Amino acid sequence: MKTIRILALHLAYGGVEKAICSMANLFVQRYPVEIISVYDMPNAPAYPLDEHVKVRYLLKDRPNQKEWRAALRGLRPISFLRESIRAVKVLVGKKIAVRRTIRSIHDGILITTRHEDNLVLSKLGDPRVWKIAQVHEDHCFDLNYLDGFRHGYSGLDVVVMLTPGLAREVRQWIPAGAKTRVVSVPNFLEHFPEPFPLEKKEKRIVAVGRLSWEKGFDRLLDCFALTREKHPDWSLRIVGDGPEQEKLEQKIAELGLGDAVVLTGRLSPAGVEEEMKRASLYAMTSLSEGFPFVLLEALSCGLPCVAYDVRVGPAAVIRPGLDGVLVPDGDREAYAARLMELMEDDARRLEMAREAQLHARDYSREKVAGIWETVLEP
């Protein structure tokens, strides 16, 4: 039987990493599965893995962005130089390890999950290997992506995008005559929470994600601040950690939101679920998304979702008016207004919460498994 190998950057917390673990748990029901993780991060795997899934790590060295930034901010030239050298060493080591690993695999199915690794698989992958490349983000018409699609993906058997729209776009950039097939396979939920009484949810908005610029949590704070005068009894909880934490803490203070906004830090999957079950609304203000896993989780917990309608992502999940609201990207006043409409209408919010839970079932493992079967076999 063919072995499925999945190449991951790491298995710590993150939407891509959760999707990888979910895929492995699905595939291992029918195939031998191995996850090849470039980095061996602390507390990884962060998400449950079937005991039959093998995990192999390529490097002991880990990325050192946190230490590098600390040295830069602290104006410590010796530490900065040391961390810069270490960063280059880690980067070069990663590139060598990925290329060596892809060259070493001569049978079965190999799935890469990052654009730069997809290019290596296309170029160096053994013809006897069934080569599948996943793209987990919106390419945003970035020239690096477009050039890769046009000139670097022809050696792949299948390219997996997360939405039909992204698949249509990428399909037109793959050269005519190439064997490469482009398909759409969404993320899926392995687990559905135990029912929580919708009537007992608190006057709380929740948002989850890495505290990095592309998640746009600064935009969420601006929007939430506009609701405070009319709804001082509502709170906002942002779950996650990351490089923007200090900036967000400063912004919370500047906006006078210290008594209403909590940055919880990173929580376990069970902790995230508990936050979602107790909240009444989910808020997303990302600058870009691929197929937001976190929106599926929010729907499954009975959370109507309010999101900026960025190019792709939220629109692939949210059904406007039924289980959420899409707001023109960047329109703070409109976003705050939509939040307040739902804050003020308990009956509508509860109906949307029920619809959200029903919609989440469309992304069960059983429903997506059939799509994957058409991808895994020639």
Mark where each language-model region is:
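Donor nucleotide-sugar binding/catalytic pocket of nucleotide-sugar-dependent glycosyltransferases
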Residues: 132-140, 154-194
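Nucleotide-activated donor-binding/catalytic signature segment of Leloir-type glycosyltransferases, i.e.
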Residues: 249-267
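Short alpha-helical donor nucleotide-sugar binding micro-motif in glycosyltransferases
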Residues: 266-267, 274-279
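Aromatic "clamp/platform" in nucleotide-sugar-dependent glycosyltransferases that forms part
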Residues: 287
